[in-house]
């Protein structure tokens, strides 16, 4: 019988010094981020200031009260060909094939008169919402949560900047609430007695979602207390422990692209667990026109740099490649 693999080491980092601590405390946090992202690729952010109980309450209420008719009317194009949207909307369960459901929404600043909305720029969509009389607190909460978790992500990026040997405001100009392409996804995994078929990894592990790299700058995830994630390490696949009210943070592919893979996106996957749970990732993105110059932190000097690329083009190509590899979520 094989020996069970030990869980991956995922440190918990108090990020509060990044919001006003002294230089030494900020440097210490940056060193902890650096170590985590160079080892397992994940860390938990504590003292983040977000009310996660309210987050759970609102998301559970939303998934509990959505009707089948509402889900279809708001479904993205992959599920409802009458809807041209490919990002914002409902991602439906498919009877006998797929049980997980989710709602994705984008920047509340993307109003009808936003320049990128008016021009029809790819990856930009003004949000649609479920009936606001039936779901009275959903839209106001979601829009405020977007602003809150975007602000949290900008704080985290100060730590990443310092970890990379840059000034703490290095990423600030690339992260504007007016044009960020960041997305929130509210994923609900149900418990079902007759669960539809699931995928199987090469090692025989039953999976809800196969191995992948997140397409983002960083991903900031809140999840309920059901262990499900695994990260690929030199020793094989290891479980990522859960951590109560803390947010799980990892680098996305753009961070690897930008830093010459000094901070690579960790390869991870979702185990099949037949238990009701929530997985609520925030994918941090720059704006469409943002162009950052890739660079080499100390350990990667001598390697050829990636060419600069407009962020919106990078996001579109990488997102399409992920869907082609792993299928529509």
Swiss-Prot record:
Protein's recorded name: Isopenicillin N synthase
Enzyme class (EC, first level): oxidoreductase
Organism: Streptomyces griseus
Positions contributing to 2-oxoglutarate binding: 277
Organismal lineage: Bacteria, Bacillati, Actinomycetota, Actinomycetes, Kitasatosporales
Record: residues binding isopenicillin N: 87, 91, 189, 279
GO BP terms: antibiotic biosynthetic process
Binding positions for Fe(2+) per the UniProt entry: 212, 214, 268
Assigned protein family: Belongs to the iron/ascorbate-dependent oxidoreductase family.
GO function term, MF aspect, one: isopenicillin-N synthase activity
Catalytic activity, reaction form: N-[(5S)-5-amino-5-carboxypentanoyl]-L-cysteinyl-D-valine + O2 = isopenicillin N + 2 H2O
Pathway, per record: Antibiotic biosynthesis; penicillin G biosynthesis; penicillin G from L-alpha-aminoadipate and L-cysteine and L-valine: step 2/3
Swiss-Prot/TrEMBL keywords: Antibiotic biosynthesis, Iron, Metal-binding, Oxidoreductase, Vitamin C
Cofactor(s) for this UniProt protein: Fe cation; L-ascorbate
């Amino acid at each position: 019988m094989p020996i069970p693999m030990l869980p991956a080491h995922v440190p918990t980092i108090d990020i509060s010094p990044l919001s006003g601590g002294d230089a030494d405390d900020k440097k210490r946090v940056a060193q902890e981020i650096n170590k985590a992202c160079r080892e397992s690729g994940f860390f938990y952010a504590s003292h983040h200031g977000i009310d996660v109980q309210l987050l759970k309450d609102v998301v559970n209420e939303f998934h509990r009260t959505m009707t089948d008719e509402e889900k279809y009317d708001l479904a993205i194009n992959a599920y409802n060909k009458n809807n041209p949207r490919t990002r914002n909307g409902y991602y439906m369960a498919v009877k006998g094939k797929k049980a997980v459901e989710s709602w994705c929404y984008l920047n509340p600043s993307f109003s009808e008169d936003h320049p990128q909305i008016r021009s029809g720029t790819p990856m930009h969509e003004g949000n649609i919402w479920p009936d606001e009389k039936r779901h009275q607190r959903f839209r106001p909460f979601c829009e405020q949560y977007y602003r809150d978790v975007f602000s949290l992500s900008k704080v985290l990026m100060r730590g990443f900047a310092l970890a990379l040997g840059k000034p703490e405001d290095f990423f600030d100009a690339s992260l504007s609430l007016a044009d960020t392409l960041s997305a929130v996804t509210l994923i609900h995994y149900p418990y079902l007695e007759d669960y539809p078929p699931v995928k199987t990894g090469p090692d025989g592990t039953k999976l809800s979602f196969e191995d992948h790299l997140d397409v983002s700058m960083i991903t900031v995830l809140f999840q309920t207390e059901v262990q499900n994630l695994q990260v690929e390490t030199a020793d094989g696949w290891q479980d990522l422990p859960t951590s109560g009210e803390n947010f799980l943070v990892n680098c996305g592919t753009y961070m690897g692209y930008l830093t010459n893979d000094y901070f690579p996106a960790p390869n991870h996957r979702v185990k099949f667990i037949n238990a009701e749970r929530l997985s609520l990732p925030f994918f941090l993105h720059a704006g469409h026109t943002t162009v950052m110059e890739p660079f080499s932190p100390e350990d990667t000097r001598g390697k050829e740099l990636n060419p600069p690329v407009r962020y919106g083009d990078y996001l579109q190509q990488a997102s399409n490649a992920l869907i082609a590899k792993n299928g529509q979520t």
